[in-house]
Amino acid sequence: GIVSIRINSPLLENIELADALVKKYDLQAAEVCLSHATDEYQLARQIGAASGEVIRRCIHDSMSIGLGWGITLKEFVDQFVGFPCKDVSVVSLLGSLTRRSSVTRFEATTELAARLDAECLYLPAPIVCDSADTRRLLIEQPLFKDIYSRALQTDLAIVSIGGLDSATIRLVDLVTDEEFDSVRAKGAIGNFLGYYIDEQAGIVDHPINDRII
């Protein structure tokens, strides 16, 4: 007869899921981590820990790194084992000016740069401007243009996608309840680099997205 052996391992399932993601979305690679998280913070911590070694393999001398913002990326940096690099810069991919400590505690650009002995650059603007006109004025400033140009040319972008309710921008009250309900009604399903996105990953046509940097 024929003996068939199958190992029912969660790790094997993760590999199969990763392969399926690569094929479906034409990716170069994907990693799926086992999680028993009971809340968003536990999930962020587990994803942060799992992504550390993957990202570490992508970092080398003479490169620029763009870094997003939020709970998951802060957990990634907090658990990341750094190493000295030469001619490396880390650029924030979102605005960095704020008066709220609740926002600052999720900023990780400074720490990642320190762990790599790298230059650190910030976008000199808030994440959410008070109006679209203010945003237009800020992005026309020479200093902003210079750093924004460098952010667009990074060799490696480290970012995360937040759920609609769990996105850090929502948790720290950078949008009002009224704005949140309104953008949800417009079809938003998540948040990427501050922008609310729909199920096709398009930026939702909503005034809040006109104020994001």
Residue ranges and their predicted role:
Residues R6-A132:
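N-terminal active-site beta-alpha-beta segment that forms phosphate/nucleotide-binding
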Residues S4-I7, I15, L97-I213:
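Conserved phosphate- and dinucleotide-binding cores of soluble alpha/beta proteins
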